[in-house]
Each structure stands twice: as C-alpha cells, then as structure tokens.
Regions:
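Proteins enriched for Cys/Gly/acidic motifs involved in redox and nucleic-acid/cofactor modification
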Residues: 1-185
C-alpha cells in the first residue's frame, strides 16, 4: 500500500443516487490512499455531495459552506470540494460565493476526482461540470465492503440500473443535473 494521502469526510445530502455516488467517491479515494474521517474537523479533504431536489437545497449548501469557513481558518490546508446536483447547476458560482471552496465537480465528473485533486495542488480552483459526451453507460460499481472506505452498512448497497431522465417535467431538475437517461445495457 502507498503512502496515506489523508482523511476524507463526505457529507451527503438528498437521494439514494447521492448515497450511491458517495460510496463511489469513498471507494475511488480509497484507491488514492485516503481513509475515512469521522468528522470534518479531522479531515484533510471534505466533500459535500449535494442534492438540488430536496427543499431549499442550495440554501443548505451555502449555509454549510458558511459554517465551514471556520474549518478552513483553523486548517488552511484542508481541501473543500462541492459535488453533486447543486454543483452541476451552480458551477463556478459556488467558487464566487464561497472562497473557502477549492473545487467543484458535477454528477458526471466524480470519477475525475483524482485529477481534480492534482489540479488543486497546483493552486488552481477547478470547476468540472462537463457532461460526458457521448453519454456513457452507467459504470459498474460494486462497493467493496471489505475496505473501511465503504460508508454503507454491510447489509445495504445501491445498484444503479439507470441514471438521468428523459422527461423534462416543469417541476423537476433531474434531467438538468443528472442528464438524459442512460442505462447499464
């Protein structure tokens, strides 16, 4: 095993798809030698995996980022990233409103986390909210429950069959944040 990069804390908001994405992030960051932190205060990397469907989602994210100013003040080396649906919608606006945020990544970009983190080491504040074109099939991801990177209880797992939606209902942001529907086959 390589050197330990540090500890990661992920705060997840919203739906089961976000829980699934969070588990993918833990697994992916585990391959980069990050271990889970039990709180933001002990983390070297803090990620907010956001939801824009639930009530007042954007306000919750910006409120949490405001509270996290203290964290950045206490530990200027902590990296703070915002991902998920609010990140997909807001993009660079997050960096403008919250100077303590180091990077933003969208729903299709979580597999790019290692590269995004390398960019932050160069002193940049990357925003990666690009839709992957052409839309890729849902990547297989089966959590490895033998590692401490998994944050789900041993008797619970998520399996994505589809991602996104083709119905642009007037009240729903899913097609805008998760993209058009793609499936495993």
């Amino acid at each position: 095993m390589g050197r330990v990069m540090g500890k990661v804390f992920i705060q997840t908001y919203g739906c089961q798809m976000n829980e699934y994405d969070t588990d993918k992030m833990f697994e992916l960051l585990g391959t980069q030698n990050y271990t889970p932190a039990s709180s933001m205060d002990e983390a070297d990397l803090v990620l907010l995996n956001t939801c824009s469907v639930r009530d007042k989602a954007e306000q919750k994210v910006y409120s949490e980022l405001g509270r996290m100013r203290r964290l950045k003040k206490q530990n200027p080396n902590v990296k703070i990233g915002v991902g998920g649906c609010v990140a997909q919608q807001e993009g660079v606006k997050i960096l403008k409103r919250a100077e303590n945020v180091d990077f933003v990544f969208g729903t299709d970009n979580l597999f790019e986390l290692p590269e995004i983190l390398k960019e932050t080491e160069k002193g940049t504040r990357p925003v990666q909210i690009n839709r992957l074109a052409p839309r890729q099939k849902v990547r297989d991801f089966i959590p490895d429950f033998s590692t401490s990177a998994s944050n789900l209880p041993a008797l619970k797992a998520h399996l994505a069959i589809t991602k996104g939606c083709n119905n642009y209902c007037s009240f729903c942001v899913v097609p805008l944040t998760r993209g058009t529907e793609v499936s495993r086959s």
